[in-house]
A protein has these predicted regions:
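P-loop NTP-binding core
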Residues: 1-200
Length: 200
């Protein structure tokens, strides 16, 4: 099972769209695919047609993760997100045990798991990064985008160097690209200069 976090500390960059489209694309190739909505806003759940009645928070109440999974109309399974993830964020913050997500998924049989993370570096995001084999970073070509991506890459490197994860940065996905826009070209040029091996 390959666990992939879709993450960026900035909101509005296309994380949810990327996560949902990847889940749908992989499911369409007959790979057993799970999408985890780790954002309390629950947009990935809504986009997948999942009800926000059960989330990963329920695992802290003793429920097995397999009881919480729903099947979307797009052939992939969904572990929905909702406002109760705020309580999970607090629980993870106060729990010294890391990798709650990976432990919860251990007995499941999926080829790929995609995690749509919140647009901030909180305990939910950190646990997703620790639990994942790799991270895809959606990035909108706009001002200050390089600062945010550098911060996230540094965080992943710190977690890896401290032995908490083997997370590798799988790549940077440019989203909402408008080739007529000079700013898009400038940011793309900078990305190709600083992260040539990571760009999609």
């Amino acid at each position: 099972m390959k666990i992939i976090a879709i993450s960026n500390q900035k909101g509005g960059v296309g994380k949810t769209t990327t996560a949902v489209n990847l889940a749908q694309a992989f499911a369409a190739t007959n790979r057993r695919t799970l999408l985890i909505d780790l954002d309390p806003q629950g947009n990935a759940s809504t986009a997948s047609g999942a009800k926000k009645i059960k989330s990963l928070f329920d695992t802290t109440l003793g429920r097995h993760v397999s009881e919480l999974i729903q099947t979307s109309s797009n052939q992939y399974d969904v572990l929905a997100g909702g406002e109760d993830l705020v309580a999970l964020e607090v629980a993870l913050r106060n729990n010294p045990t890391k990798g709650h997500i990976a432990k919860s998924l251990k007995e499941l049989n999926y080829d790929f798991v995609f995690i749509d993370t919140p647009p901030s570096l909180n305990s939910l995001t950190l646990d997703a990064l620790i639990s994942s084999d790799g991270t895809l970073i959606p990035l909108q070509c706009e001002y200050y985008s390089l600062e945010g991506i550098t911060s996230l890459i540094n965080t992943i490197n710190e977690l890896t160097n401290s032995g908490l994860t083997n997370n590798k940065i799988f790549g940077i996905i440019r989203t909402m690209v408008d080739k007529r826009n000079n700013l898009t070209k400038d940011v793309s040029d900078d990305l190709e200069k600083y992260f040539p091996k990571l760009l999609f």
